[in-house]
Every structure is written in structure tokens, then in C-alpha cells.
Amino acid sequence: MRRSLAPSQRGPLRPESRHSFTPPLLKKNKRSCQQELEREQELDRRRLGALRDASNTSELPLPIRFTANSEYELAIAKVLARKFKVPMDNYVPDYGGKRVLGVRRCISRRPLHDPMACNALVLFHPPAYTEHERMGMDPTKVLVHVVVDPLLSNILRPHQREGVRFMYECVEGKRGNFNGCIMADEMGLGKTLQCVTLVWTLLRQGPECKPTINKAIVVSPSSLVKNWEKEFTKWLHGRLLCLPMEGGTKENTIRALEQFSMTSARLGTPVLLISYETFRIYAEILCKYEVGMVICDEGHRLKNSDNLTYQALMGLKTKRRVLLSGTPIQNDLTEYYSLVNFVNPEMLGTAAVFKRNFESAILRGQNTDSTEQERQRAIEKTQELIGLVDQCIIRRTNQILTKYLPVKFEMVICAKLTAIQLELYTNFLKSDQVRRSLADCNEKASLTALADITTLKKICSHPDLIYEKLTAREKGFENSQNVLPSNYKPKDLNPELSGKFMLLDFMLAAIRAEGNDKVVLISNYTQTLDLFEQLARKRKYGFVRLDGTMSIKKRSKVVDRFNDPESDSFLFMLSSKAGGCGLNLIGANRLFMFDPDWNPANDEQAMARVWRDGQKKPCYIYRLVASGSIEEKILQRQTHKKSLSSTIIDNNESAEKHFTRDDLKDLFTFDANILSDTHDKLKCKRCVQNIQMKPPPEDTDCTSHLSQWYHCSNNRGLPDNILAQAWMDCKCVSFVFHHRSQAQEIVPSAEEEATDQPEEKPESRKRSSTPASDDSADEDFRGF
């Protein structure tokens, strides 16, 4: 048929045919309708005949005019009345397939996902109405269930489902008159996945049958921006597009942020991923307009309410604030107050009111020399504070992971100083330099004292780290030039000059010889990483190194290469300041923490690199400290801080309180003949002359206080044959604390449950790529 004969080319339709089909019986009586139908059928027969004749001649027929009563229109109406069928194999619709083509959906509200489906996670339940009440209600105002997308609810673990529900109730004001919360889960519990679930749910639905928010902002360290984008893509399979702010010119960044901020309608990229530094620079743009919700990853960066980043984020026009931090208390309660005040302003009052009502009383009761009245008041104030913050904080420990992960053995190893280290250490303590530092020391330790502390820590690691000070005859080393042996070579590492390095060398050799385990070596100093490199080259071990000088893109490749079972990398050398947070190093199952940090959170983050989802082997964590030295004093300071965190965050009233502030001030004392200064200060009742006579309580594990661990003054009873053999061979170990996690339960991991997801290599979460200076490890030191 020629195209000019097509109905669309034959002129306009009759006016009545432009509307939807209306049965003629509604307008005319039966007889007139029958007559009109017969006339239309006769006209249709004539038109069809004209079309057949026109196909053989050049003559054009009269214009074809379809009416609402034609058989053609009746057929179309029947097609449109059919049930809508999704063209997918084995597709089962949520509501019985009641949708039809061409018909406007029913105006009655219903949830986006079926609340009665198997494994459904319902975040909001509407009020239960009787049928009589429903008859008198406006169907367009009925509240509906808020149900998490089955794509996510089917892979969430029980504690993650609880976390999503808690955060939803907080941001929606269901748990008091506040809209913020702190997700304080420890590392490895899936805080990112829980936040992805929350954001996706709020962007898609709400009780009013419409999205709760139209956009959200995720603020994180710069090295985590790309990882957040990959996490959204991984869990949502590309259903949500994000706007990552990394790189790019200033003009392009301003244009993108202005477009994101000004648009109030639904965006194509409703989630902005931005670093703390970039947010601070462009805060003026982002704070002009309202935003649905803000999420702050690694939220302990906001511990100081006076810094510019904190103040910029406080200016953001949003009531829904979520802060992620596995360590909300790192140093003191003032920092904790800053975090709570960020998510829920005025919950705890002003800073002065908080200090007067809570902080002073709690800290006085924490000291061992406190009176009974002070301890009782501290308990009362602690319970009062817990009652307030419980409305907005959720905290789960790594204990949950025991059912998903292999067993973990954690050991604190006290290594003896060598004769050379001992002479350098004692000479420095007796020097005029240290005496002047102690004389000037006040509530906030002077910069000179901090430098002296760093020097002592380096002596504990290896004399090579202070070689330049020795040759330059700096203050404190005027009488130590002849301590090093005559054959000493600064660029040729000699492990025998350090007790910790000698132990490390023995253990690495045994691990390499006895199996295919891989090892992570962590230090707070890049100079120590240089010594690790020298040792690896000397023993011909394959290794990779990650510190602050490595670009973010290269980090991901390095991690993937190390985790590959086929790679020849035996060691992963890591700077805790540059990459101790978020890296997934499950290719290794042994980790050495070579030197302690003042902040226990930094050490905890670094030591969580191997015992994570995907780990298949038993894990061994070794923490090395020099016996009786300042490193043990730092370990004791960590115990004090963890006791405070345990009391406030974990609601553990029986947290041990063994160290007074006077004990913690005693940094520059040293006893060369002691097995473990920490064990002596514990005043352990289970040991007699440093020999354990009674095992720890059965309900304890490696998360318990050191006083509840196993205590070993010899190599008998150690859980690790490698350490037991090294203790006997190198004779440089004086004491060991050790414990293990609870037994593993056979439970599928999240990756195994998500069978419908494409395989993807684990993505690492990285910290800022700013190079870490050697002295940065003491930035969290506080005066006692």
C-alpha cells in the first residue's frame, strides 16, 4: 500500500474519535445504535473495496475516517484492557500483576515494595485502620509502609538490619526530638553498606508515598571519595548515580556544586561525594540551600568543634545528620561531646554545661585514688549520660564478627632491649636535655618533651633511626658516640642491634619457611618502613609498600596485587598514618604492629586490616613493645583511654581502672630488669612471681582488658608455635599477653549470600594521601 493511503495521511479524524472509546449505548437508544452500527459497517466495507481497487489503479479513494464504533477501535480497547506483563522470564510481580496498559493507575496509595514478602525489612509501619475508618479517609492521604529494597535487604546481616532501622528512626525523629545519630560500630561491621541502604531508601520512598529526601551529601577523607562511589555502584548495581568531587578545575567544581545545591527537584545525581577539605573550601555554596541528609565518614575528624571543617559542616542546612566512627572516644569526653553536638545540637547543652555536669565527675571517678563518694557520683553521671546518648548512638563490637570470621589470636609481646639500645636509652634519660624537659613539663607537655619522647621511641625500634643525632652530637647524645660497634654500617641493617628487629627477623624467617602465610608490617614512622625494606631485600622477601607518598589510584592496584594468591609479595609494609584505616588486606593473616601510638584508635584501625570479611585463615596479631620502656607507658595510656571509651560507649561499668594519672606522667622512668612494667602495674592476682596460676575467666576474649588475658613469662602455653620457637631461639622476649576471639560459627558471608551480584574484587578504603611526617605519630599525645 502506498504511504499516501495510510490513515495518518488521509486527513483529520472526526471530533468524536479523538476521545477515548465511549459505548454508544450510553447516548442513544438500542434501535438507533443498531442502525448506526450497520451504516458504519457498510461504509467500512466500501472503504476496504476502494483500497483494493486503488492498489491496481492510480485513482485515490476517498479519505478513510475511523470512528469510535469500528471493529478496529474495539480490538484496540481489548488490547489495552489486558493485564500488564513484564517481558522477563520467570518474573513474579509483587501485587499479582494487576496493572494494565493504557489505564491510569489507581490513586490509592501502596508501598514501593511488598511488606509481606519473605525477608522484608520494614522501617515504618502505618497505623492500623479499621474498614470503617478507611471508608471515611482520603485515599490520597493514607500512610504506607517503608520497605527496604529487596536487592539490599536480602544481603544485610542481622546486625546490619538493626543498624539501618536505628538510623532511619533517628533521622526521621522517631527516637526523641532529634534527627541525627552516630553509627559507632567497630571496624568491619559494614557501616558503609548500612548507609547505602539508608540513602537509597530515603531517596526512593517515604510514609507519604513519595521520596523522603531529594539529595544527600557524603563527606569523607579525600582518599575515600572514590571508594564511596564504588560502594554505591557495587550494592545498587548502577541504579543510583553519584557526583564525586575529586580533581577537576575550580570553575568546573563550582559549576557542579552550584547545580547540585540549587536544584530542588529530583536530580540525576542525587548523592554528592566530597572530601572534608573540598567541603570546607566550597562551604559557602553548599550551605546556601537545604539538603536532605549529610553523612560524615571517619567522623572522629570532627572531634574539635573549633576547627574550620566542623564549623563549615555545622552551617549546612539539614536536620538529618549521620556520623560514622568506630572510635567516637579517642582521647577525652570533650571530643565526644563535639561529635554528639554535631549530629544533635543542644542535646547535651553547651560545652561548659557538659563539662560541669558530666566530664569532671566521670574523670574523677575513673582514677584509682578516687574516693567512694566520687566513684559513686561518677557511676550516676555515667548512667545519666548513657541514657541521653543512647537515643542517638548505636555501638556494636567486633564480637559480632566471630560468627563469620576465623579465629583471631592477639598477642602483646614485650621484647628486651639489646645492650646497645640499653646504653643509648639510659644515657639519654640521664642527659641534661631530659632533665630540662622534665623541669618544664606542665599539664600540657612542652614541644621539647614531645621531641624527647619521639627519640626514646626510635631508640626502642632500632639505633639506625637516631644515627644522625649520634653523629651530629645532638643534645642528649653528647656521651654516646662510641656506643655503636666499630664495624657499624648505617646503610646495612643489622637486626641484632634491636631486640624487636631480631624477634621480627626470626619470626618472618619461620613464617616464610613453614607455610604460605603473608604478613603485614605496620609502623607509625616512615623511617621504620625504610628499615623493613632493607630487611626484606637482605632476606630476599617479595614486598609492597604503602605510605603517604603513594597516589590514591596506585594504592588500589598495590592492595589488589598483594591480595592476589598468585602474587609473590610476602610482606605488605604500611604506614599507619597514611593507610591504617579501611584497607582490606585479607591476602595476609599475620600482622605485626611494630610500635604503639598514643591514640588507641589508630592502633585498633591498623590492626583490623587482616581480620575482615573474606578472610579464610586463622589470624595472628603481634604487638611489639620494648620491655620497661616508654612504649609500655604508651600501652598503659591506651588502656586508660580504652577504659574511658568502654565505660561511656560500651556501657561497661566494670572497666578496669588500674592506672592513676601520676602513673601515666612517669614516662621517663626505666627499669632494665623488669619483665613487663605493664604487668607489674596491673597487680595481677592470677599470677605469682610472674607465673600464671589461674587462667582468665571463660567469658573473656581478646576484646577484654589486659588483666583478663593469658600472662606468659616463658614460651609454654603460647597459641602460636612461630612465636614460641622464636622466643627460644633469639632469647629476646621477656613477657607475653595473649588471648583469642570466640570460636567461629559457620555462617555465609554477605558476599556469599549475594549470589545475584557480579564478582568484584574487594575495594579498599583509604585515608588521606598527605605524607605522614615521622613526628606525626605523637599528634594525639595529651598532657596527663
From Swiss-Prot:
Modified residues annotated as Phosphoserine in this record: S20
Location (main, coarse): nucleus
One GO BP: meiotic DNA repair synthesis
Helicase ATP-binding domain ranges (all copies): 172-346
Highest taxon in the source lineage: Eukaryota
Annotated consequence of substituting K191R: Partial ATPase and low chromatin remodeling activity
Molecular function terms, GO-annotated: ATP binding; ATP hydrolysis activity; ATP-dependent chromatin remodeler activity; DNA binding; DNA translocase activity; helicase activity
Keyword ATP-binding assigned: yes
Phenotype of the disrupted gene, per the record: Eggs and embryos exhibit variable alterations along the dorsal-ventral and anterior-posterior axes. There is a reduction in the level of meiotic recombination and an increase in the frequency of non-disjunction. Larvae have increased sensitivity to ionizing radiation and MMS.
Modification Phosphothreonine occurs at: T22
Region (Disordered): 1-36, 745-784
Pfam families: Helicase_C, SNF2-rel_dom
Subcellular location: Nucleus
Motif mapping: DEGH box: 297-300
InterPro entries (alphabetical): Helicase_ATP-bd, Helicase_C-like, P-loop_NTPase, SNF2-like_sf, SNF2/RAD54-like_C, SNF2_N, SNF2_RAD54_helicase_repair
Region (Required for chromatin remodeling, strand pairing activities and coupling of ATPase activity): 2-9
GO cellular component, one term: nucleus
Protein keywords: ATP-binding, Cell cycle, Cell division, DNA damage, DNA repair, DNA-binding, Helicase, Hydrolase, Meiosis, Mitosis, Nucleotide-binding, Nucleus, Phosphoprotein
Documented EC number(s): 3.6.4.-
EC class name: hydrolase
Gene3D superfamilies (UniProt xref): P-loop containing nucleotide triphosphate hydrolases (3.40.50.300), SWI2/SNF2 ATPases, N-terminal domain (1.20.120.850), Tandem AAA-ATPase domain (3.40.50.10810)
Occurrences of domain Helicase C-terminal (ranges): 503-660
Family of this protein: Belongs to the SNF2/RAD54 helicase family.
Function description: Involved in mitotic DNA repair and meiotic recombination. Functions in the recombinational DNA repair pathway. Essential for interhomolog gene conversion (GC), but may have a less important role in intersister GC than spn-A/Rad51. In the presence of DNA, spn-A/Rad51 enhances the ATPase activity of okr/Rad54.
Record text on subunit structure and interactions: Interacts (via N-terminus) with spn-A/Rad51.
Protein name (record): DNA repair and recombination protein RAD54-like
Species for this entry: Drosophila melanogaster (Fruit fly)
